[in-house]
């Protein structure tokens, strides 16, 4: 496997795949990310979503797409002989990295959308995913005025803030030795035998967000002493962090992070 130029290769060098063996024993299969149990506590950090400053728009992504098709301003989506537009809905959702879209948009908290729609932030028995907020969508498609969370990756701002909070809560601070793992699915699903694992300092972990060849934040990040583990599942809109009660309380009280306890996914 080829290495990136510095600073990634010097600050976060590749290490053996066996570094994940303990996670395999603890969590089971890590194809979409090693999902840890509480250690002894846990919390879910929610991926960010955004809304146009002028508020809600009744037009959905799917309606907008079909209007463009009718006007001839976009081409039909096909796979072989299959017309995807005839059998699918343009939801507005995405996959992978995300960040604040810039002027004209604001972050929309899950708690605010829950109050607006009457939907729970995360329905009982579920995890943060595309199944949340059915009342916000029209026939499965989000309003064009909203940018829903992406699957499989933290947004950049939340990732950076997590690094800050994790650094503040450990005895070694930013010098905490950590390891990071990317699911094969986040690397193009081309190599399922040689797992991509890197080791470095927590204080240098912002670099990991921009790993060449991946459009995702790490699937797992954990302290080398195994005091905490972070998992961003490829199919979900949130990241589970397992660790001490003090760490979990710090995350729940961080104003830059939106975090919730999910007793059924503890």
Model-derived features with residue positions:
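Surface-exposed beta-strand edges and their flanking turn/coil or helix-capping segments
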Residues: 60, 194, 210-213, 243-245, ...
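Extended, low-hydrophobicity segments enriched in charged/polar residues
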Residues: 1-209
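Intrinsically disordered, low-complexity segments enriched in Gly and acidic/Ser/Thr residues
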Residues: 190-236
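Alpha-helical oligomerization segments
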Residues: 226-266
């Amino acid at each position: 496997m080829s290495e990136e130029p510095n600073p990634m290769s010097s600050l976060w060098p590749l290490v053996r795949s066996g570094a994940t063996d303990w996670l395999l024993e603890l969590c089971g299969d890590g194809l979409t990310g090693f999902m840890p149990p509480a250690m002894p506590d846990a919390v879910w950090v929610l991926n960010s979503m955004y809304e146009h400053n002028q508020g809600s728009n009744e037009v959905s992504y799917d309606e907008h797409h079909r209007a463009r098709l009718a006007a001839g301003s976009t081409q039909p989506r096909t796979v072989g002989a299959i017309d995807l537009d005839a059998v699918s809905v343009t939801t507005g959702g995405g996959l992978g990295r995300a960040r604040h879209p810039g002027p004209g948009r604001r972050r929309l908290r899950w708690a605010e959308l829950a109050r607006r729609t009457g939907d729970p932030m995360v329905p009982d028995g579920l995890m943060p995913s595309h199944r949340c907020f059915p009342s916000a969508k029209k026939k499965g498609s989000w309003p064009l005025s909203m940018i829903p969370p992406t699957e499989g990756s933290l947004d950049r701002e939340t990732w950076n803030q997590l690094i800050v909070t994790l650094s503040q809560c450990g005895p070694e601070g930013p010098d905490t030795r950590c390891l990071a793992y990317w699911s094969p699915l986040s690397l193009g699903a081309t190599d399922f035998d040689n797992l991509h694992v890197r080791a470095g300092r927590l204080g240098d972990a912002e670099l990991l967000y921009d790993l060449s060849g991946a459009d995702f934040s790490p699937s797992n990040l954990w302290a080398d002493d195994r005091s905490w583990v972070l998992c961003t599942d490829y199919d979900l809109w949130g990241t589970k962090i397992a660790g001490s009660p003090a760490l979990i309380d710090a995350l729940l009280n961080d104003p830059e992070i939106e975090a919730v306890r999910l007793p059924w996914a503890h």
